[in-house]
Amino acid sequence: TPLYSSAASDVYKRQLHGLANQECLKFVLEVRNHFNGTPTQDELKQFCWDRLNSGRVIPGYGHAVLRCPDPRFTAFMGFGKDHIEDDDIFSIVESLFEVVPPVLQEQGKAKNPWPNVDAASGSLLYYYGLTDFNYYTVLFSISRAMGMIAQMVINRAIGIPITRPKSVTTEWIKNNV
């Protein structure tokens, strides 16, 4: 239904989901442009410290739930290592994975210094020719929609009834939330 579709996808329009891989890729491109290519690990470490000391974050690092590298990040990195050769952007992503977690641990503010899926996904899209950032959220949403559709098919196949949450009024929400 339209309501279900909207409820399922509207969460991706905000920056934390909707723009996350774009922001990560913009950061990687900023690094590449700053150093005219791939920096050394020492240069990258200083660049990250300068960014943190100016009050900004390192995009793609930290996850609300995970306390280890995001398994999706690990899968994307494995794919990139197997299929991408001599690419500055992917090399920077690899170097960031080695540099950023220790920097964030030393800084002491991050509960989770590990990369999330967005730290790698944008670099793969960019490498394979999708350079218009406006489509990144579309692909993210489609991947989520495919998962929801698959779950709906499985639910129908095994006879699980349609879920109809109890309806509440706006007044109830105001009083109880």
Which role fits each region the language model picked out?
Residues 1-8, 12:
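Single conserved hydrophobic/aromatic residue that forms the stacking wall/gate
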Residues 63-84:
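C-terminal domain-closing interface element
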Residues 13-68:
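Long, well-ordered mid-to-C-terminal structural blocks that present hydrophobic/aromatic surfaces
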Residues 38, 50-56, 73, 82-177:
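Acidic, carboxylate-rich catalytic segments that either coordinate divalent cations
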Residues 5, 21, 139-142:
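Short alpha-helical patches at coil-to-helix transitions and adjacent helical residues
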